[in-house]
């Protein structure tokens, strides 16, 4: 199992020339992703410019709100606010309804009425579907799934373990 190459359609935080790229395939409704979020945020902050972080949607529960949360993040992305919305969605502890999603958008300064309209009309549904299909083609069947420089991270998502794996990847990249 390998992640697909990073494209301009991905949600990327960090420099392209960072020695380590960490890709997360995640789902805003997944309790394991919710639990992993603060660990990943801590790691992102700790490694700074040495780490490029990529988040890819895998809404898989079949619940309508599952896909709606991903669509809400895409609505925010279209306005340059993916990462603030990403954080807002994970702070909702995996429980989202239309009103919570609209409130999350408003909390980061987006227009609530525009968000509601985009979610009701499913403006970003096709984009989320395409991302989900791409994840399946990469062999992703569970969330969260992490890759460090293209290699699947197989350990528990705990800060000391993940940081150690990233440190090893930095050392390997340095030659």
Regions found by a protein language model. Give the residues of each.
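Structural alpha/beta surface segment adjacent to cysteine/selenocysteine redox centers
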Residues: 23-24, 28-106, 111, 116, ...
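N-terminal targeting signals for export/organelle localization
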Residues: 1-4, 175
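Short, flexible micro-motifs
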Residues: 17, 83, 145
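A short beta-strand-turn-helix
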Residues: 3-20
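C-terminal cap of thioredoxin/glutaredoxin-like
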Residues: 25-26, 32-44, 103-175
């Amino acid at each position: 199992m390998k992640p697909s190459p990073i494209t301009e359609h991905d949600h990327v935080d960090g420099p392209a020339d960072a020695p380590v790229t960490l890709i997360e395939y995640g789902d805003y409704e997944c309790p394991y992703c919710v639990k992993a979020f603060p660990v990943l945020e801590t790691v992102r902050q700790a490694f700074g410019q040495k780490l490029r972080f990529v988040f890819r949607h895998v809404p898989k529960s079949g619940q309508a709100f599952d896909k709606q949360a991903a669509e809400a993040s895409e609505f925010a992305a279209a306005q340059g606010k993916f990462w603030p919305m990403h954080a807002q969605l994970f702070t909702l502890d995996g429980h989202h309804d239309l009103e919570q999603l609209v409130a999350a958008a408003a909390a980061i300064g987006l227009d609530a009425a525009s968000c509601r309209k985009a979610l009701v009309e499913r403006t970003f549904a096709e984009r989320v579907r395409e991302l989900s299909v791409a994840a399946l083609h990469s062999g992703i069947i569970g969330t969260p799934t992490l890759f460090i420089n293209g290699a699947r991270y197989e350990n528990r998502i705990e800060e000391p373990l993940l940081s150690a794996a990233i440190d090893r990847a930095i050392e390997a990249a340095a030659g």
